[in-house]
Each structure stands twice: as structure tokens, then as C-alpha cells.
């Protein structure tokens, strides 16, 4: 989130802020502080020290070391943007300018933008299906085939399917116990070879899904085989997840067999994410990362780092609420760093969530704090080269004109023009 997790055990929530941190001064100046080209280092937060001072805090290793390096220290760039109004803050390429071009021997011409739908909102949003196998399992052959047909008919080129693989169970979230996940074996009511082949034949590639549960060693042990599988069956994009409700709960298995718990935004995870994106490039796969580290512009060198979450996205409106002003905060905080997989496009804004999977009872308290017009505006304001239409087909069918906008709006733009804006109010 744009101002959330603490940087050490002694901090309480919001005693330190992730970057980009945006500040509006009394004289009207808007200041944003961030970092770029974060590789083989630890992520910084900014902690208030009184008298208007902010101090950089690095997420340490479990032994207290801030950064572990072999030969030389190469820190990320730290930079400050200053503008006399909020609109000018949005018109900057500094984060990309502080990163490097791809290596000369790397060809990323295979990276393509697109739009995708997903078997996902009916689990986390409408609560009518489950990730795990049950009579209401979402990732079953007949349902996925229906989604593929609907996506193809409406010119989407991707379909995310969550809950396709072995390891899901009702208590999977969110303790950090992700050890059982397999990233190569599908459950018995999901035929990955048939569905990927069928989707490819009608112009809709499966969007792969790797929820790790924050168990890094389990994922890295399977990384090569998992990416080989996706490359073989024609997957182009993978959404990865690291759901873990405790920030310092990433299990690291040390060479001697002991276990340490590392910070989600520390160097251990920075190195892991780097390994994932480089391995994905080898197999011509794009990564859409959820529960990521912050975007620091690495997409310039690795264009297959196509999008990421990194703030409270639409999913929180499924089981909680982002509030009405959250959407107009993000362009001036999280989105300053790069593309965001917010997953917009929810049209059924109330009477959408069932009390439990298989139930006919509606949770009357569940409301998405939005309007259809606002959901459409997100496709213009929230940049993501791989953009999602997150709602269910049955909800889009009710609103054909609005759905037509989602189908036709670009995901890549040749020019950006910020007409006017005011933080937390409009853009």
C-alpha cells in the first residue's frame, strides 16, 4: 500500500512508509520520493524523525544485517520529484531513465500487450466458487471452456485461471503455509493440455497462475519445470502471488537446514524476484506479480516484467472495502512507480457476494465503492500493458455498451496528457 508496512520490529504500522511517498507542502509544492533500479539490495522505507526529517530504513535480514554483498556496493538510485501541481508530478519518466536497457543479446520482441479475463472474481469477489476442489470448484473444464469462448467472442487474448493446480485447500490463506503447492500438476477436473490447446486455437492463451503462499524454496525448486510447462503449452503471461499476512514471515531454509523468517521486502525477496523475472525471460514468459516488491523501473531492462499489484487492488473490494478516495490516491503514489494490475471493470457493485459458495443467500453488506463510469475511467488512468476485465461474463452481458468500452479501449498509449487533477479527488 502507499503508506503501510513497518521497516523493523520496533515500528508500529505507518511509523514508516513505502515509496513512492508523496507529500503536499503548505506552499503548494508536491514532492515524491522513490528509488530506481533496485537489484541485489534491500528495499527502503522512509521513517519520520521529527522536525520534518525523514530517514531511510532498510528491511534487514533476520540476523540484523541490512545488505549482504560479495565485492562492491551498488545501491539503487534514490530520487526526489518536485512539482508545483499534482498533474505535473504524473508527467515524468525519471524512473525509467535511471534504469538500464536490455542486454544486447536479449530479444524481447515477443513481449506483447493485451487484455484478459479470469476465473477469479467468482472466488474472491462473488464467493460462489472455491479455489480448492469441491462441488463449487471454479477451475473446472466446463466453466473454463465457457470463459474461453466468451473471451474469444469479445476479443480478449488471455484467461487467468486460479485454483488449477494441486495444493489448494480451505485453509490455504494466509499463514505462509504454501508448501503443498505444485506448479506442474493440475487437479483432476482441470485438463491443462486440452484447455490450453483449445484456448490457443481460438486466440485466447491461458494466463498462468502461481500462488506461492510465500514459500520461496518450494517455488524455486519447481521454477524451471513450471516455466518449461507453460512455454510448451503456449502460456504467455503468468500471475504470481505471495499471499502472507505477516510481513516478516518469509520462510528461508538455510544450507545447514535451519529456518529463518525474512521480511517480504528485504534483500532475500529482492533476489528471489530477480531470479523469477530472469528465468521467465529465458522461457519467453511475462510476469504479472502480486504481493510484489515496489516497482523501481526494471521493466526497462526486463520488458517481460509487464505489470504488478503493489497496493490495495480491486480484490479488497470483494471482501472488504478500499473506500471512495483510494482510487484517486493511487495515481499520485503507487502508480508513479509503474504499471499496476489493479484488476478493474467490476459492473455488479452490490448484491454480488454470496454468504458462502453454493449458498443462495446474498451478503447485503458487500458493496464495491464505485460506479460503472468510475470502473471504465480506471482503464484510462491506471496503466497496465496486460489489463484485466475482472467481472463475470454474466455481469458484462447486462451492460453491453459499457462492456464495449472495455473491449475497445487501448492498453498502450503513444502520448499522455494530464488535463487536471487534485490528489484524493480527481484526475
What are these regions (language model features)?
Residues 72, 110, 140, 144, ...:
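Active-site-proximal structural scaffolding
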